[in-house]
Regions:
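Negatively charged
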Residues: 1-122
Length: 122
């Protein structure tokens, strides 16, 4: 199985430039997944299977080129309890995520810190 991506601001983080498809993987965590992937964009029209995920902490932290599409708004985030620093430093991120279910979230500490152009209703 391949349940987790974990760059955590290291490794080949600069080589990942696009996510074009999430596939049918049953993910278990996105904690620090694309942290530091400053060349990353997201064009996938499918959605990641997040039913086994409780943390998106630092998922896109420092992803300074992060642009996405409308599919991100349809992610099922009902099992997520930690959204801390998800978009911290994602300076060009400005995607609508108003449909995200945050009912289970217990912390959103610094979720949008330094996401300087983010201006969406949430």
């Amino acid at each position: 199985s391949f349940p987790q991506i974990y760059f955590n601001n290291g490794g080949d983080k600069l080589k990942i430039t696009n996510i074009s498809q999430w596939g049918s993987i049953a993910w278990t965590s996105f904690d620090s997944a694309f942290y530091g992937a400053s060349n990353l964009t997201l064009t996938a029209v499918d959605t990641p299977t997040l039913t086994g995920v409780t943390s998106l902490r630092r998922m896109f932290q420092g992803a300074t080129s992060l642009t996405t599409n409308a599919a991100m708004n349809t992610w099922d985030t009902s099992t997520i309890s930690n959204m801390s620093e998800v978009f911290l430093g994602a300076t060009v991120f400005n995607q609508n995520i108003g449909a995200w279910d945050t009912g289970a979230v217990t912390t959103m500490l610094s979720m949008f810190q330094s996401a300087t152009i983010f201006n969406q209703n949430i």
